[in-house]
């Protein structure tokens, strides 16, 4: 590159990075509501966004999240009034690569690959390699309660390198359905997150 090409490239990359909004703003734009700062159901160290009857025709409840350095923990806590069919991931790859959900309560299905979404099950997404025919379906008149942990790839691979584990074999194992041992491990973590009522900075220490 000559100096002019380099300056132009830096400008393009800077504009691209500026286009990726903060996760808080991403959630706010997607849900089309302001943060429910008075809702104390989950830890105040995170952020809670609520859907009431007038905000959505198909679901009512709340979404809570805590964002750390390289990871996001979130809780979906909704009553599904009408069948929900989700066929895209709304650019989640901008924020996390691997996203595992421990499902406390649900009645639905995930397609391509197929998996039933039922209580006490684990559902993992690789947002960097999600397929175009991805479909996520929740049936009407059901409660959807799930605790999820999403990691950026850089954080995962840094940790894998430190313990000498091959990333490809790790991802291959992680994305297999019906992992009883991993599901049981995440069940304990999920219940602790659901029951955490700590404020910052104690909650920051707990979530990290």
How does the language model describe each region?
Residues 22, 27, 45, 59, ...:
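A sequence-composition feature that detects small, non-aromatic residues
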Residues 80-82, 102-106, 153:
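Beta-strand elements of well-folded, non-transmembrane domains
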Residues 2-94:
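N-terminal low-complexity or simple alpha-helical regulatory segments
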Residues 46-48, 53-54, 59-61, 103, ...:
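Mixed-charge, polar/low-complexity N-terminal
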Residues 74-77, 97-101, 145-152:
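Short hydrophobic beta-strand segments that form the core of ligand-binding sensory/regulatory domains
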């Amino acid at each position: 590159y000559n100096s002019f090409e380099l300056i132009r490239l830096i400008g393009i990359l800077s504009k691209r990075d500026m286009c990726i909004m903060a996760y808080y703003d991403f959630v706010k734009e997607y849900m089309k509501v302001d943060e429910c700062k008075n809702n104390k159901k989950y830890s105040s160290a995170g952020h809670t966004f609520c859907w009431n009857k007038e905000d959505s025709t198909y679901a009512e409840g709340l979404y809570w999240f805590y964002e750390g350095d390289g990871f996001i923990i979130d809780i979906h806590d909704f009553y599904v009034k009408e069948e929900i069919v989700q066929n895209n991931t709304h650019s989640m790859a901008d924020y996390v690569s691997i996203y595992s959900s421990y499902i406390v309560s649900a009645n639905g299905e995930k397609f391509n690959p197929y998996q039933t979404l039922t209580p006490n099950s684990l559902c993992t997404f690789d947002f960097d390699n999600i397929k175009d025919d991805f479909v996520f379906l929740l049936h009407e008149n059901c409660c959807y309660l799930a605790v999820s942990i999403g990691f950026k790839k850089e954080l995962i691979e840094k940790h894998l390198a430190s313990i000498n584990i091959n990333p490809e074999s790790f991802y291959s194992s992680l994305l297999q359905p019906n992992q009883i041992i991993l599901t049981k491990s995440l069940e304990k973590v999920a219940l602790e997150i659901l029951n955490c009522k700590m404020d910052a900075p104690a909650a920051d220490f707990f979530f990290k």
